Amino acid sequence: MPSHLIKSGISKAPHRSLLKALGITDNELKRPFIGVVHSFSEIVPGHVHLRTVVEAVKAGVRTAGGVPFELPVIGVCDGIAMNHEGMKYSLASRELIADSVEVMVKAHQFDALVFVPNCDKIVPGMLIAAMRLNLPAIFVSGGPMLAGRVRGKSVSLSNVFEGVGAVAAGLMSEEELLEYENYACPGCGSCAGMFTANSMNCLTEAIGMALPGNGTIPAVYAERLRLAKLSGEKVMELLSQNIRPRDIFTRESLLNGLAVDMALGCSTNTVLHLAAVAYEAGVEFDLNLVNEVSERTPNLCRLSPAGPHHMEDLYFAGGIPAVMKELSKKGLIREDLLTVSGKTVGENLKNAVNKNPEVIRPIDNPYSETGGLAILFGTLAPRGAVVKKSAVLPEMLTHTGPARVFDSEEDATTAILTGQIKKGDVVVIRYEGPKGGPGMREMLTPTSALAGMGLDKDVALITDGRFSGATRGAAIGHVSPEGYEGGPIALVREGDLIKIDIPGQRLDLLVSEEELNQRKARLQIPEPKIKEGYLARYQKLVSSANLGAVFLK
């Protein structure tokens, strides 16, 4: 075992002395050392309770004969980081998390790992680390926040963001917005809709890297602590059987994850993160695969922001096992694959039941015959762009309109909130990609403003940046190549017609090739916005969104 490198033999007496300074006994030195990697902090609602979850994990590890050690990593709250320079650091933190886990694990030679993430970039950051290190590992998240209630209606953070736009449009009073502010987020956990954090926690379960229940058991339920204890016990079984992440995360389990992604209508960020995890694991992935899976996978759920349901509703309906059970009825799930439970997918699904067909539509009565996400290609996005089509109103699935061009999120948001955007417009926000931002910010504030003002049925928004999982409407992101790399989005001018055809998977700039070539010859890329610190280094290393915005090997 790796830990023998720090505790066995005469030459390791100094190492053992330091371990004994921690209170480790001679008996414990004979046992496996288990790293419990978590992202507790007091500034992130999704993480503020993780110490309690971690204590349960450690209890499970000890029960099964291991010695647990906590390893904290950073974690950004995307909601608090939204719409200012802090959002530039969100996606960039994913690579920092993966690298820091690698450093701690290699330096201290753990035998196996339990990962305890919860929010947006922490989950994929830890998944990347798990694939890179390939030590026996299991995930158990902190769990979703319960929905809030305002005037008898279930609500979440997305309602507060949209409320800002509603106030600007005169559709809501400031007093009513304050009510949403006070009650939309009732306590700890990842925000209550099918936003990025919950999407990734559900997909971690779907690909077999977490036990059933990981994605949906509410943060405040004792069942979450029981799951954490069981995960601590299970990692010892994985260690004894030498089952490693790359044994579980294969191309076939990736396809299972994508199928669940389409059925749930997950965040567009899942495409970025699954691509990154697959790259680290050596599993083939390209954007065409997303469309292939989407074409054959029905959309069964419409959770917030696409519909009225929240994560607790999905939990009570049977959770991810119930969704996978529905998909398996049409052969859309590979059931013979290994999971961290020690059982196959099929064995995990044996007793799964869809307890609420209003929350999880039966496979023969889906919301749509195709999945919740689509990849668009065309003259504006030669290497692809992504849209959460399950959150797009029917009248905006196809749309042609004049471009309103902005070189930053702030400029676009100001224009929207001051009434400068009209029905039919296509808002274009560029130079917000992985390199151009740098950091590929989420455009939740402008999309929420449009939705809150009632313009989501008339206005589209296109960007080389990203969107929050809380975004709804005709919001098309990850446009590749990005503007900073001279992609066509950098050539768009005010008033150019843009054609969106989501069913046809097309995104086109209706400008002649001759004109575009002339514009490209005169194009001047803006100077880097940040020239020092971590983001300056990140900008030099990060790849395009269609590759997962990874650091290429």
Swiss-Prot record:
Its EC number is 4.2.1.9. GO terms for biological process: isoleucine biosynthetic process; L-valine biosynthetic process. It is an enzyme of class 4 (lyase). Its cofactor is [2Fe-2S] cluster; Mg(2+). The active site is at S468 (proton acceptor). Gene3D superfamilies: IlvD/EDD C-terminal domain-like (3.50.30.80). [2Fe-2S] cluster binds at C119, C191. It catalyses: (2R)-2,3-dihydroxy-3-methylbutanoate = 3-methyl-2-oxobutanoate + H2O; (2R,3R)-2,3-dihydroxy-3-methylpentanoate = (S)-3-methyl-2-oxopentanoate + H2O. Mg(2+) binds at D78, D120, K121, E442. Functions in the biosynthesis of branched-chain amino acids. Catalyzes the dehydration of (2R,3R)-2,3-dihydroxy-3-methylpentanoate (2,3-dihydroxy-3-methylvalerate) into 2-oxo-3-methylpentanoate (2-oxo-3-methylvalerate) and of (2R)-2,3-dihydroxy-3-methylbutanoate (2,3-dihydroxyisovalerate) into 2-oxo-3-methylbutanoate (2-oxoisovalerate), the penultimate precursor to L-isoleucine and L-valine, respectively. This is Dihydroxy-acid dehydratase.
